[in-house]
């Protein structure tokens, strides 16, 4: 059995191994494969039985020209890079990795928030540059600092990751306002309740995006919805970049309507030099690393191997195109 991994570098830049897949068949791992040249994708898959992809597209053309494919594993939770309908037509299961990064992504959302509230990186830098040593007072701060206790955290998308973020927010003394199409009353308590979107927008001091990217959520942070928000709101996004209309957020940051934003995702990745967010006020941008702690990546690898093992046993799991 031949296994091809089209783009394995981000998952395993060298601190993990591929032994789990190698034990199941001949395994060829490419660090990267073209996102646009489908001939390269097709050539690399060749006569493989099993294909793993993270961000490399697999449209209909790939399935048509690679007839040996029996199983596709997506090395991520999102699977929009694979034409799952064509795969289903051909009887090919596509399996994703649904829960590997819950804790890491929730933790990172709060890390963005705490950096916005305390400017730890900036103050560390200026201390090392000598500003504290030369200061006439025993302490100083270059930016206003924010206490979160008692403030409202609005979370759009209250699935596993939204709940993980909400749990930490509640531990910091925040009250969670959750918006989700599917409500679980068991999650409600004195510090967490479900609300409609307009109430979340108008009552939240911090808004975190943890919803999937669907047509109905694309651009959910736009000028119309920003106008409904509190003045000085903080916006966090480590879900999907296109949830935000970036120019609308830039305008709101520069006007002060939005006090700050913490973003681990943008509309086009890697970010382009002309992205207006790069020039916006009070905008922290990190390079899509919420998912990337070694513990999280090891969990992803283990689930990816298990997905294939279960398929080979005849009982596939985490299939997204049943």
UniProtKB/Swiss-Prot annotation:
Keyword Nucleotide-binding belongs to the record: yes
Organism placement in taxonomy: Bacteria, Bacillati, Bacillota, Clostridia, Lachnospirales
Pfam family, one: 2-Hacid_dh
Gene name for this UniProt entry: hpr
Catalytic activity: (R)-glycerate + NAD(+) = 3-hydroxypyruvate + NADH + H(+)
EC number(s) reported in the record: 1.1.1.81
The protein's annotated pathway: Carbohydrate metabolism
Organism: Blautia hydrogenotrophica (strain DSM 10507 / JCM 14656 / S5a33)
Family: Belongs to the D-isomer specific 2-hydroxyacid dehydrogenase family.
Top EC class, one word: oxidoreductase
InterPro entries with a match to the protein in the record: D-iso_2-hydroxyacid_DH_PdxB (IPR050418), D-isomer_2_OHA_DH_cat_dom (IPR006139), D-isomer_DH_CS (IPR029753), D-isomer_DH_CS1 (IPR029752), D-isomer_DH_NAD-bd (IPR006140), NAD(P)-bd_dom_sf (IPR036291)
Name this protein carries in UniProt: Hydroxypyruvate reductase
Keywords per UniProt: Carbohydrate metabolism, NAD, Nucleotide-binding, Oxidoreductase
Binding site for NAD(+): 160-161, 180, 211-212, 238-240, 264
Function (record text): Involved in catabolism of D-apiose. Catalyzes the reduction of 3-hydroxypyruvate to glycerate.
